[in-house]
Amino acid sequence: MSSGLVLPAAPGGVSDEMAAFAAALIDRTGQAPVIEAALARPTGRRRPLPARAVLAALVCLALEDRPPFITEATRLLFGRLSPASRVLLGVPGGPAATRRAFLAAYRRVRYCFHAICSVMDPSPLPKNRRLSQQDLRARTRPMTSAQAKAARDRLEAFINSLLEASISVLDEEERAAFDGCTGLDATPVPLFSRGPSARTGLSASDPDGGWYIREGDHRERQDDKGKPLRKICWALEATIAVTARPPGAPPAHPNLAAGLALARPGEDPGGTGARVLASVAARGHKPGWLGYDRAYTAAVPARFHLPARALGYSPVMDYRADQLGIQASSGGALLVEGSWYCPALPEPLIAATARLRGHSIGHDLYDRQIAARAAYQLKRKDGPDTDGYQRLSCPATGGHPRLICPLRPASLSPRDGRPKVLQPPDEPPRICQQTAITIPPGAGARYRQDLPYASPAWHARYATLRNTTEGLNGYAKDPAHQALAQPARRRVRGIAACSLFTALLLMAANIRKIRAWRALTAGGKAATAQRARRRRASLRDYLPDG
């Protein structure tokens, strides 16, 4: 279905066209009526400013590459908008011509913004003051875990509806080009707050954050010698799902942020990632290859890997040094770096990656050993079925056995160049006795992947997915545009406000990407950007007219 929305002109002021576009995006989220219903009270004075107007103003600021300050939103609603746009957004009264009128308008906008955040704030902690631990506990609102989870679900539904509204701008052809390839990554979103002080015992003015550490799963902790790891910033961690393209395929759609959730650094990265993927899938985006870094490889399988597979994603992952080699076994089959192999897989092939990282072998030998693993890999017979169970058979069975094995007489002829099992197991396991074995979904769930690790296909897929994800992170953090890494541009504290601002900035980044994509592909031109010309003369100058 066509989007029905026309992108406004590049930022250069809030025109009626941009205001209408921002209002249409908010309408497409379907969240403004939900917020109004949650804020409705049977008694008391009616709130004069609708939530839709404040949200549309923040969208306009994000599209303009301006900081989403409450003061800027007030100036836009009560000064920069035309009368027609104010009527469209339901802004009462006229422009705020005096300072007194502006302050009154500012109070209305600020009240409305905080009311919006209160509907979906999962944090009971007080903000904007550096408190002692005793005062922090005394001022913490009572909130049960069920209430916090419900508020978190409302918050994540809201911010993902903002991203979906920006994706809905794509036309039918652009949406159909997405084949399900997805990158998942967590990136720090620094907060406008200093961290807690170990010397004074005072809390952070935004206690919803945590120290972001570059290593591991980004939690604050000590290294193996008991020395605290270097803290990068006081931040929240944004888990972002990004649409991607197959490796080597010509660009057919822009790569956009499709899912988002924020949490403290290192706080249940697997569960947060699974919620993001579930949101993407629930909105109708097809699942496909899923690339992520080692922080997710180490997650609890029941929190991340199994939910991701249940949603239909096929993981493409890397491993830490302590995760290499044999990772699991089932029915005698060995799970070696993500794939199931014959139990007679030679030790040099099992230890190939560990030896490469230990500089015991070179890349040429390593590539040959990775290629040699293919003969020992179990053959897919059928599945996985709807329950996740898969039937795999011995590589020395079938009409075209890849191995010569004395336990499989049919594989002994012809005597060609196929690898030969020289030392079969003394007590053959089920994989050596049966035609096939059934692998349950939980066997080696943390490490299993469908592409042989370090194979050319794995390298191409993993590099493409990871580069796409890191590219989107850098794109959204560009100081000239969304500046996601600049906390001074996001001064309202709390996880609810930070999540809303992050979603608005990613929404604006998506719109900027769509606009750039269409500019590159307009008129049937190749969707490959050329570097700006620096030479004074070019052979292209002599092309004939027409």
Residue locations for each model-derived region?
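Long, low-complexity, polar/charged, intrinsically disordered or flexibly structured peripheral segments
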Residues: G180-G183, P188-S193, S197-R214, E220, ...
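Dynamic "connector" segments at or just before major functional cores
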Residues: M1-I70, L81-S161, T528, G546
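Short amphipathic alpha-helical segments and their helix-coil junctions
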Residues: A24-G44, G216-E220, A454, Q482-R490
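Short amphipathic alpha-helical "interface-anchor" segments enriched in bulky aromatics
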Residues: G331-P384, Q390-S393, A445-S455, H459-R491
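Structural motif
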Residues: R41-R52, P228-K231, T464, R490-L500
